[in-house]
């Protein structure tokens, strides 16, 4: 005996529409998650570029390598391009997906991060330009500078790691590390001021 379908045509239409809408929502969520995963990958890549810029800038200062300094200046355009690519992806996520709450905070945080990382590239290029055009005497102060460079590289790595993993503990360590870098900066500045005062002609 055939089983009668008790749904009216209108009810069946509503049910089909609901199924289609749920499928559309799932598809949009999957696409959004895929784009977020891509965002994470691109942030990791940009973080690596910034770490390399810091490391190479320290080497350039240590060795007064003018040719390597020119490479760092050129490398800044790669970091700038990475920033633009990530910014475009974030804008696409905001316009197409219209994220709210946690998702919106995630995209907004990425936009803030790339601004700060792009600034690292700019600073590295600025230092490289100085090395390429002037004599920077190598002294004991380079030890402090090396500590600053290593601490800053670790901060970049940990900050991106905290973002990707959503790890509050790592984020707190990054905040604490900033105090260490600030202390090294003050120490370095005092040493440089002492040198200038003792050798005003060189300053």
Residue positions per predicted region:
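Cytosolic, long alpha-helical scaffolding segments
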Residues: 7, 19-203
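Compositionally biased, intrinsically disordered low-complexity regions used as flexible
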Residues: 1-7
